[in-house]
């Protein structure tokens, strides 16, 4: 194995030892059951780590990530994850979290061709086209940030319209949706736009 991979294992051992030192029995409890109250639907971007951003430990948040935090009704991966979170784990809050500086959103805004992912980014281009009247009056330097916000809102709507959430709400289950956009340059927690 390469030194870089060995370094990952070393870091994991250090992290696990620190967790056990500061929270004795943490891993025993974690091995038995997860009971998160939160689900995070976010971007795959390595700069946007769900647990670290909101200060939650493993087991406290259920996470689904993809390029540009997209939720579409044909994505069985996302829908299955949402269903598991809502029906099995009984999460109380689902946060759809976009982030400023999202490369996927930028590529969709520009209409850039990047390969297979173009098919995925088409969903964000649909958001762009649906809100063209808003984006057209925004200065060029602010369009990507605005599209990040619009995309987060549209994905919240998609989650809300899913059969999973519709059935949960019809059954009286208490699940709240939130749309957030995280700013890496702000060094702060997400600003809620519920």
Residue ranges: model-predicted function:
Residues 1-72, 76:
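Short, conserved "active-site rim" segments that organize catalytic pockets and cofactor/ligand binding
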Residues 43, 99-100, 180-182:
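Short, well-ordered beta-to-alpha junction loops that form the rim of enzyme active sites
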Residues 187-194:
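Conserved small/polar residues in nucleotide/adenosyl-binding loops
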Residues 125-181:
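Polyanion-binding loop/helix "lid" in catalytic or ligand-binding cores
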Residues 3, 52, 57-144, 154:
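Short HxH-centered metal-ligating active-site micro-motif
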């Amino acid at each position: 194995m390469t030194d870089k991979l060995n370094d990952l294992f070393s870091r994991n051992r250090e992290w696990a030892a620190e967790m056990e030192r500061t929270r004795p029995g943490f891993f025993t409890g974690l091995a038995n059951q997860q009971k998160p109250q939160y689900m995070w639907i976010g971007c795959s971007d390595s700069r946007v780590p769900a647990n670290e951003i909101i200060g939650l430990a493993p087991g406290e948040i259920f996470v689904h990530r993809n390029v540009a935090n997209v939720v579409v009704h044909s994505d069985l991966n996302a829908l299955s994850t949402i269903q598991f979170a809502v029906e099995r784990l009984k999460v109380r809050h689902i946060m759809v979290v976009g982030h400023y500086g999202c490369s996927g959103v930028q590529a969709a805004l520009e209409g850039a061709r990047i390969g297979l992912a173009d098919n995925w980014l088409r969903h964000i281009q649909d958001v762009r086209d649906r809100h063209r009247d808003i984006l057209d009056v925004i200065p060029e330097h602010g369009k990507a940030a605005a599209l990040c916000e619009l995309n987060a809102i549209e994905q919240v709507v998609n989650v809300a319209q899913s059969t999973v959430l519709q059935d949960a709400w019809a059954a009286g289950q208490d699940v709240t949706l939130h749309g957030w956009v995280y700013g890496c340059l702000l060094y702060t927690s997400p600003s809620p736009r519920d």
